[in-house]
Amino acid sequence: MYKRQDLTEENLRLTKEERAVLDYVTREYRHVIVVFNVANMPEMGWLEEYDTIDAALMIGIPGTVGMQAVADVLAGKVNPSGRLTDTIAYQVEDHPSSANFGNYRYPGTLKTYIEYQESIYVGYRYFETFAPEKVQYPFGYGLSYTDFRWDVHSISTDGETVKAEVQVTNCGQRAGKDVVQVYFSAPYQKGGLEKSAICLAGYAKTELLAPGASQTVTVQFDFSDMASYGEKEQAWVLEAGDYTVSVRRNVRQSVAEEQLPLAERKVLRYDDKTGAPIQNLFSDVNGEITYFSRSNPEATYPQGPMTKLTDAVRNADTEPAPKTEGTVPTTGAVYE
């Protein structure tokens, strides 16, 4: 089954022809594996409609050489250990971005555009904050041909760095790899800085572990990575309060968590690598767009394109006239 476009919701749903193929295959075969050779996340709610579908494999677009690895996974020669980098919802329209699906042009111009009205609430940041019940397969989800036990040794901070240490043991019958994921939840006040309910902070993958083998992995990140951007302050802000750091198998499945308190509010006005001052960029192109907000989700939920061209956008891609004088070099000349 092949599609080359994703400009509308229908392009991410099964066609009648695809549904007919699935009906036939699942009726004639007792064990079916669905392989998704796709770049975007199609609608997958139909996987639960067929009792004979045993598994689904998300392979992206691996090309001809990559398909050899897919065959090895299907044959059991290689144990899959990938994790979803997207949230798979039951329906396409469950994604706020679907309100802006399409190929839009500003009136009277050839300029195309897409409006990201969902603000920071993209993917799991939206679903885990507002609509967890609409998720079929959560961010970070993935299965293996074996089982792993986790023993969380510590979740700690020295005020500058946050570190989690986890011992992973293969307690199954096949060799395999596992992925330890670490998330954080920052203190939030309604009407304050925009923050999602949970954010990925880091992850680590084990080596290939034989049955019974163990490995201790460490995931660490800067405490300042938990800051939120304040557009009015033009700075990154760490608000005072408890920061919850959790070790998880995916964004939904927590194994252990720790509260890390911050006594005083911190404002980060300079880049910690370059020392350059932090400031807003491109604020003049926002126009009249209403951005999705945690403080009032019903009133700010994306409704579709505004189709108004601001002067800032109109002139954004205009090439400035050269200000220097000189002679244009001769092209195609032959020199002896």
Residue ranges and their predicted role:
Residues R27-V32, D51-D54:
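A short helix->loop->beta-strand "cap" motif at the edges of active sites that frequently abuts
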Residues V251-Q259:
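Beta-sandwich strand segments
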Residues K190-E231:
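Intrinsically disordered, low-complexity Pro/Gly/Ser/Thr-rich segments with frequent PxxP/GP/PP motifs
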Residues N37, P42-K177, A240-R248, P261, ...:
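Secreted, periplasmic, or luminal enzymes acting at the cell surface/secretory milieu
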Residues A175-V182, Y229-K232, E257:
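Short, hydrophobic/aromatic beta-strand segments
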Residues Q173-I198:
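Short acidic, flexible loop segments centered on an aromatic residue
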Residues M1-Y2:
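Conserved small/polar residues in nucleotide/adenosyl-binding loops
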Residues Q220-V251:
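Short, surface-exposed ligand- or partner-binding patches at beta-edge/loop junctions that are enriched
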